[in-house]
Amino acid sequence: MAEWHDTTEEYLEAILEIEEEGTIPIRARLVERLGLSAPAVSETVNRLVDHGYAELLDDRSLRLTDKGREVATSIVRRHRLAERLLVDIIGLEWEKVHKEADRWEHAISADVEEKLVQLLGDPATCPHGNPIPGSAHKVEGPASVPLTQLQPGPVIVRRISEKVEIDDDAIAFLAGAELIPGSNAVVIRTSTDGVQVKSATGEQTVPRKLAQLMYVIPA
């Protein structure tokens, strides 16, 4: 039962994160997101539907029920609080915290969650800039847009998509280039290959696929 509980949380978390990106959740995106086979994903999705966590719509997309959304929101909140703890208090490297928080999120009780909020000061975002559900603090300032959409000039990195966090090479590239939330950079030019930027470590080209998942604001 514990294994099914963790699997349920992982799937619901993935569906909610796909929604956050403005994308329609379908089984193919869960296959990509979770790195599992299509038959395995289909079997688990059917169980989610049978247990009342999600609905399979006529267009084959998935929609969380109120029950499923409550669980998904809770696990995303615990995950992002765990990431803040790992970075802010423990000092784990930014690029390592996502996978570590994946291990922690299932073990954090309501009492521990409450203490984490007090310890961390009820943060608005995780270290990757994504909002923590239920925080009393909201992200202020102009809405961020993908790096590919801005004209040349200075920018501030606001957040990195959850989709990037599961890509070891991409997250390592951003850490090495110091293109993490809160950092400053200058967009030099945008091309079909990507976005050439100058950061604290010098000039580099951010591949277009990655740049589309980096959200920035004009500096």
Segments from the language model and where they lie:
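Short acidic, hydrophobic short linear motifs in intrinsically disordered regions
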Residues: 21-31
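Key DNA-contact positions within bacterial/archaeal DNA-binding proteins
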Residues: 39, 95
